[in-house]
Each structure stands twice: as C-alpha cells, then as structure tokens.
C-alpha cells in the first residue's frame, strides 16, 4: 500500500466518523475499504484506533463489513448501537495527524 493510499484511507475514516459516526463510515463508500483502513491504521501505529474500528465491524451482522456498499448497508445496526465507539474515536486515543506526518516523513514512504 502506498503512503498516499494510507493517508487517504485514514483521512476518509476520520472525516466520515467525525461527520456522522461509524454508522456513516460504513453506510458510505469509505466503508468499502474497511479491511484496508484497519491495515492503514496499523501501518501508521494507530493500534488503538484500529481496535476501535475492528470492534465497530464486530457489531455489524455476522461481524463482517461487506466490501459492497449496499450489502454493508443491509447489515448495519442502528446508529445508537455504535455510539459508544464513536465517543471512543472522538477522544483520539491515537493522534492521527501526528502519526500520519511521522509516517509520511519516513524515508521508505
């Protein structure tokens, strides 16, 4: 995964969750790349944010985030079922901006 792709995935997650919670992330096309987003978070060292996203995935029916948007929308719980995870995300247990900057500054990226 390129550094640019890592940046894009993390920013999309952050934008969607900050705008409407994990429900919005999964409902919209950003959720198409859920597995890749978890990987991107881990690559920049945002393990706590990756854990929050994985726990959000576990709350979808069957604990899986289908890659296809409309299939994913059918397995979404009510927004309130994800609210506690939204609040954990909003507390920013990992400083995504700093971690992204550090990741981009690495010579191999």
Could you tell me what each predicted segment is?
Residues 1-34, 40-109:
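Extended, alpha-helix-rich binding/interface surfaces that flank or overlap catalytic cores
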């Amino acid at each position: 995964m390129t550094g640019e792709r890592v940046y894009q995935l993390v920013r999309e997650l952050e934008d969607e969750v900050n705008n409407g919670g994990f429900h919005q992330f999964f409902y919209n096309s950003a959720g198409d790349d859920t597995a890749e987003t978890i990987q991107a978070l881990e690559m920049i060292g945002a393990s706590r944010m990756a854990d929050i996203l994985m726990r959000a995935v576990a709350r979808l029916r069957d604990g899986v985030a289908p890659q296809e948007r409309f299939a994913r929308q059918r397995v979404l719980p009510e927004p309130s079922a994800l609210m506690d995870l939204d609040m954990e995300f909003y507390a920013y247990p990992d400083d995504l901006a700093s971690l992204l900057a550090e990741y981009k500054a690495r010579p191999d990226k």
